[in-house]
Amino acid sequence: CWSLVGSEMCIRDRVMAANTTEGIIGAGTLLSKEDVYAAKRAGASFGVSPGVTDQILNACAEVKLPLLPGAATPSEVMNLLSKGYSVQKFFPAQSNGGIAALKSILGPMPDVSFCPTGGVTSTNALDYLSLENVVCVGGSWVAPKDKIKAADWQAITKLAHHASALSKHSDA
């Protein structure tokens, strides 16, 4: 997922450079309907938000942009589930109970799957991925700000390869 932070052109460049047989480009962090429209214009295949508003949901529906909406509480999870979102971003994961919270949510809400972000690291990613209701994880460890600022694409590529090797069935 590529950050929108003032960079519709950046997403467009990534979409044009991507080999669609190897992956898709998502856009985040969507915070407004304008962000949704910018992501769609840039060619993003999906959007990601840390939380959700009716404005974001309506804009995504209007432009047919699939959304990974954020939720942090059982009420937010239930609200999104009632609107058809069975896969949700759990953010910020660590400060909202992390693995223990996701285990607790599984009992009463087994039909919801999550992508936890916020406090997920290369060290604890496999712990999250071992959970039945976690389909993937996200974390800034893949592209740390210092590596981006230094244009250290080789280091970021190495981190991305390591992250892509993580799975529910690996010991990476």
List each model region and its residues.
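Single conserved hydrophobic/aromatic residue that forms the stacking wall/gate
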Residues: 1-6, 10-11
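Active-site beta-loop-alpha junctions enriched in small/polar residues
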Residues: 7, 28-32, 52, 72, ...
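Glycine/small-residue-rich loop that forms an oxyanion/phosphate-binding "nest" at active or ligand-binding sites
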Residues: 12-73
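Short helix-capping segments at alpha-helix termini
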Residues: 17-23, 109-111, 170-172
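Hydrophobic faces of well-ordered beta-strands that scaffold small-molecule active sites
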Residues: 25-28, 47-48, 67-70, 88-90, ...
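Catalytic cores of alpha/beta
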Residues: 32-42, 75-83, 100, 120-136
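Glycine-rich phosphate-binding active-site loops on the catalytic face of alpha/beta enzymes
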Residues: 50-56, 89-99, 133-155
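C-terminal helical cap(s) of enzyme catalytic domains, especially alpha/beta-barrels
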Residues: 60-62, 146-172
